[in-house]
Amino acid sequence: MFKINKKAGVDEVGRGCLAGPVFAAAVILSNKINVKDIKDSKKIPFRKRLLLSKYIKKNSIYAVGTASVEEINKINILNASLLSMKRALDKLKLKPSIVYIDGLFAPKDLKIKYKTFVKGDEKITCISAASIVAKATRDVFMIRLGKKFPKYKWNKNFGYGTKEHLNGIRKYGITKHHRKNFKPIHNILMSKTRETL
């Protein structure tokens, strides 16, 4: 078993997507991990991100939490993001001594000492590691989901509001995996309603 420092980094991904759950990861890194390539997941190409995620998982104690589209629609994306973070932390097999959280807000009812960091995924290694694991895990999930819904190109856009995704929504409507309360989707649905009047 490797030595660890008991500091956990937590980050979520998928807040800005129009489809799919929001994912979060909590990561406690090994002291021996090579941190050179661990940085904000958004700045790492897809294939390298998958390899880094695998490396981080092998050299850490980690857990992943999610919040569903239904929960996002019901409690809003901020609260759903915090819920996914809480779920990731609750699933950790080791209780950290402190949690470093990306962003301004922390999940409710955390019974662990924590600090929040704006742009923490760019500054704090354990948060960057959590960002990589969360994004790689969500990307793979969306690729698999995209096989069932190929018209929306989720294998390329991962649920984000790209031109091809928005065109897919306009042409084919929405699925149960779409966040119907999000403004771009709401606007498309409203324009379709007006067209039928």
Protein language model regions, located:
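RNase H-like, Mg2+-dependent phosphodiesterase core
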Residues: M1-L197
